[in-house]
Swiss-Prot record:
BP terms from Gene Ontology: D-glucose import; intracellular calcium ion homeostasis; regulation of release of sequestered calcium ion into cytosol by sarcoplasmic reticulum
Top-level taxon: Eukaryota
Record protein name field: Dehydrogenase/reductase SDR family member 7C
Keywords for this protein: Membrane, NAD, NADP, Oxidoreductase, Sarcoplasmic reticulum, Signal
Residues involved in NAD(+) binding: 47, 49, 192, 196, 227
Entry-linked InterPro entries: NAD(P)-bd_dom_sf, Sc_DH/Rdtase_CS, SDR_fam, SDR_family_member_7C
SUPFAM superfamilies, per the entry: NAD(P)-binding Rossmann-fold domains
CDD domains listed in its UniProt record: 11beta-HSD1_like_SDR_c
Record-annotated membrane-spanning stretches: none
Catalytic activity: all-trans-retinol + NAD(+) = all-trans-retinal + NADH + H(+)
GO cellular component, one term: sarcoplasmic reticulum membrane
The protein's role, per its UniProt record: NADH-dependent oxidoreductase which catalyzes the oxidation of all-trans-retinol to all-trans-retinal. Plays a role in the regulation of cardiac and skeletal muscle metabolic functions. Maintains Ca(2+) intracellular homeostasis by repressing Ca(2+) release from the sarcoplasmic reticulum (SR) in myotubes, possibly through local alternations in NAD/NADH or retinol/retinal. Also plays a role in Ca(2+) homeostasis by controlling Ca(2+) overload in the cytosol and the SR in myotubes.
């Protein structure tokens, strides 16, 4: 029996490996077929994540509308996509559109341009985001408004402009690439966290409103999207619980990982996705069920960072 088991084990492992390979290939092909011929609008396509989303959806055969506020960088992205396109597979030439979401006045015209060109939008990926970090009392109200325009008013203005077309056709999907700070705030990121809370609240409400029209609202929330070559600095991060938490939080996820998750979200029509390791995920639940403990840990971390002495 022992000899037979030893002989069967390699065959079993080989069989499992084969099944996993088949599953991965089927999933990959299914992902591509889910966006084939679909009109997909990607905002801030010239960012790290925007480029990766453009690559994934272009390979999948989508009719891309790439939005960005720098024409030269849009053209560079266009050239990169065309140069790596597989001639044996059906792909479409992307449409380039200048769009700065912080300038809300131009958003309706951009939406009209896209609808006039294609007649519809099947998938909108709200990817644009502007970050700011600093003590709340040192951030000007003007900067607060700028961040809210880019991260909240811009995306919802574009969404509102394209949504009637989706409702009338009774089909469509809107993906908000948000941030885990839409669930809980981190010190010195008050304005950014506020904009992410606002965006998440809007799309959570919208999800229920448009469900009867078969329009899907999805949110993808990573800890943060790191650049291609930036990694956390080494340091004495193990000194306390809060430092361990923030150390885990700062690793973030790579743009390639997020782009692939956005594709899976579109394919499976997921409603909410968190991309984080267990520590930040646990923090979401701690914030919900044990808020006083959560606030105490975060406040303790701020005091240590600023070297503020304890009272008494």
């Amino acid at each position: 029996m022992g000899v037979m088991a030893m002989l069967m084990l390699p065959l079993l492992l080989l069989g499992i490996s084969g099944l996993l390979f088949i599953y991965q290939e089927v999933s990959r092909l299914w992902s591509k077929s889910a966006v084939q011929n679909k009109v997909v609008v990607i905002t801030d396509a010239i960012s790290g994540l925007g480029k990766e989303c453009a690559r994934v959806f272009h390979t999948g055969g989508a009719r891309l509308v790439l939005c960005g506020k720098n024409w030269e960088r849009l053209e560079n992205l266009y050239d990169a996509l065309i140069s790596v396109a597989d001639p044996s597979k059906q792909t479409f030439t992307p449409k380039l559109v200048l769009l700065d979401l912080s300038d809300i006045s131009c958003v309706p015209d951009v939406a009209k341009e896209v609808l006039d060109c294609y007649g519809c939008v099947d998938i909108l990926i709200n990817n644009a985001s502007v970050k700011v970090k600093g003590p709340a009392h040192k951030i000007s109200l003007e900067l607060d408004k700028k961040i809210m325009d880019a991260n909240y008013f811009g995306p919802i203005t574009l969404t509102k402009a394209l949504l009637p077309n989706m409702i009338s056709r009774r089909t469509g999907q809107i993906v908000l690439v948000n941030n885990i700070q839409g669930k809980f705030g981190i010190p010195f990121r008050t304005t950014y966290a506020a904009s992410k809370h606002a965006a998440l609240g809007f799309f959570d409400c919208l999800r229920a409103e448009v469900e009867e029209y078969d329009v899907v609202i999805s949110t993808v929330s990573p800890t943060f999207i790191r650049s291609y070559h930036v990694y956390p600095e080494q340091g004495n991060w193990e000194a306390s619980i809060w430092k361990f938490f923030f150390r885990k939080l700062t690793y973030g996820v790579h743009p390639v990982e997020v782009a692939e998750e956005v594709m899976r979200t579109v394919r499976r029509k997921k409603q909410e996705v968190f991309m984080a390791n267990p520590i930040p995920k646990a923090a979401v639940y701690v914030r919900t069920f044990f808020p006083e403990f959560f606030f105490a840990v975060v406040a303790c971390g701020v005091k240590e960072k600023l070297n503020v002495p304890e009272e008494g």
